[in-house]
A protein has these predicted regions:
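Helix-loop boundary and gating motifs at the non-cytosolic
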Residues: 11-70, 229-270
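Central cavity-lining transmembrane alpha-helices of secondary-active solute carriers
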Residues: 63-81, 271-283
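Helix-to-loop junctions at the C-terminal end of transmembrane segments
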Residues: 75-87, 280-292, 377-378
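Structural signature of the two symmetry-related core transmembrane helices
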Residues: 90-105, 295-310, 388
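Cytoplasmic helix-loop-helix junction between adjacent transmembrane helices
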Residues: 120-157
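Glycine-rich segments within core transmembrane alpha-helices of 12-TM secondary carriers
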Residues: 151-172, 361-370
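A membrane-interface helix-boundary motif in multi-pass transporters
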Residues: 173-195, 375-394
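C-terminal membrane-cytosol helix-exit motif in multi-pass small-molecule transporters
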Residues: 195-214, 400-405
Length: 419
């Protein structure tokens, strides 16, 4: 325990020290990540809560979420290729434009078709933004330091997400009490503020210089070994995506409808979880040096299943808050280490393509599972079974990840580097 505590302190110092020495462009990308975190917080947590508040059924919510997510599946087929071919910065800006267009549609009156198109646009935007921004960071640091850059980027992104989710849940009822408008009007103001925030990353990303690369055949870099790595990573990613859609997007509604949490409580539970994740992302990179990135990721993901399964049996909201926070911490905190690991086992020329194709597997499974989940819940958010299904898929994916990738070394651990 003392060793882990020291590693946590060392991790925080190392991450902060790295950022203090970072250049203007790295800091610009990190600052842009704050605002993409705001967008992500509203779309991931607040949106489905809003849909439930305006009386969409679970089947309709599943349909909107599934169709919207399916659109991003199509985008992931060519998004990574475009990022590698025409530039990550240009594609990020295109994705941001799609996200803004989708957010504007949520300002309209309740309409299943319009909201489905809106969610499709935001999903499309996210599928272009994420691999582009992630790979923009890679060229700004050495492989061995990458986890620290992703750590601070994840920390800042999570701070934006935390603020957005808290205000997204708590803001509308407070505005109703203080100013008089309906709560639903408050939700629309949340979407309006999010739309404004979506313009800010443009300022930071335009200032980033992207190294021009000579055109080359991407297929030449996808050799047999790389294709095998891509398949295994995508397969376990799909299992996690399928499990996630069964439960995770529905949790705010479950907290409210099944466990009796008010809007304020829902906001506090999710805010606490996100704040802890933010701190974790700042300190966790150093922990990878204990047993390696793969072991850290697999152990944390498997450990997250127990608190997830216990959630529907919670006797009090404070227990819900603790279990949800522990689950989120264990499942999500290793993400910067995972991002750095994936970047370090692929070559520069195909990194965006690799990320897009592997995320395609996650998103395709997530989209199909989202629709299934709507019928599985059937407007009864007291069921424990979806938690068991999700937990089983998480464990299976984590075991597959560990069994295969514990043999795959990162580029800075090899001499010569992976080619």
């Amino acid at each position: 325990l003392a060793g882990f505590a020291r590693a946590g302190q060392d991790g925080a110092r190392a991450t902060a020290g790295y950022y203090s020495k970072a250049g203007r462009e790295e800091k610009g990308i990190v600052k842009a990540s704050f605002f993409t975190g705001v967008i992500g917080g509203v779309l991931w947590y607040v949106l489905i809560y809003y849909w439930a508040a305006i009386d969409f059924s679970s089947e309709q919510i599943g349909l909107m979420g599934g169709i919207g997510s399916a659109v991003s599946v199509i985008t992931y087929l060519f998004g990574g290729y475009l990022a590698d071919a025409i530039g990550r910065k240009k594609l990020f800006l295109v994705g941001l434009g799609c996200t803004i267009a989708g957010l504007l549609l949520f300002l309209t009156e309740k309409n299943l078709a319009v909201f489905t198109v809106g969610y499709a646009l935001t999903s499309l935007g996210g599928s272009l933004e994420w691999p582009s921004l992630t790979t923009l960071l890679v060229a700004k640091t050495k492989p061995a330091d990458m986890k620290f850059l992703y750590g601070v980027q994840g920390f800042v992104n999570q701070i934006g997400l935390t603020i957005a989710t808290f205000l997204g849940f708590v803001g509308p009822p407070i505005m109703e009490d203080l100013l008089g408008p309906e709560t639903l009007t408050g939700f629309k103001l949340v979407f309006l503020a999010t739309t404004i925030c979506a313009f800010v990353p443009i300022i930071y990303v335009l200032g980033v210089k992207e190294t021009e690369r000579k055109p080359s055949s991407l297929r030449a870099h996808f050799n047999k070994r790389t294709r095998r790595i891509l398949f295994m990573y995508s397969f376990q990613n799909a299992l996690i995506g399928f499990g996630a859609a069964l439960v995770i997007p529905w949790l705010p509604v479950i907290f409210n409808r099944s466990l009796g949490a008010s809007d304020m409580w829902v906001g506090m539970i999710i805010t606490l979880s996100n704040a802890v994740i933010a701190v974790g992302w700042f300190v966790v990179p150093k922990f990878a040096e204990f047993r390696g990135s793969v072991t850290l990721i697999a152990v944390c993901q498997i450990a997250s299943v127990a608190p997830l399964i216990l959630l529907p049996y919670s006797p009090a909201l404070i227990v819900v808050a603790v279990l949800y926070t522990v689950r989120s911490f264990l499942m999500l905190v290793p993400q910067p280490v995972l991002n750095a690991y994936v970047m370090n086992i692929t070559v520069e020329e195909i990194r965006a393509s690799f990320l897009s194709l592997s995320q395609l597997a996650w998103q395709a499974a997530f989209a199909g599972s989202y629709v299934i989940a709507g019928y599985l819940w059937a407007n009864d958010y007291t069921k424990p079974e979806p938690f068991y299904y999700a937990g089983a898929l998480y464990v299976a994916a984590s075991l597959i990840f560990f069994a295969y990738f514990r043999r795959i070394k990162e580029s800075h651990e090899l001499a010569p580097a992976i080619t």
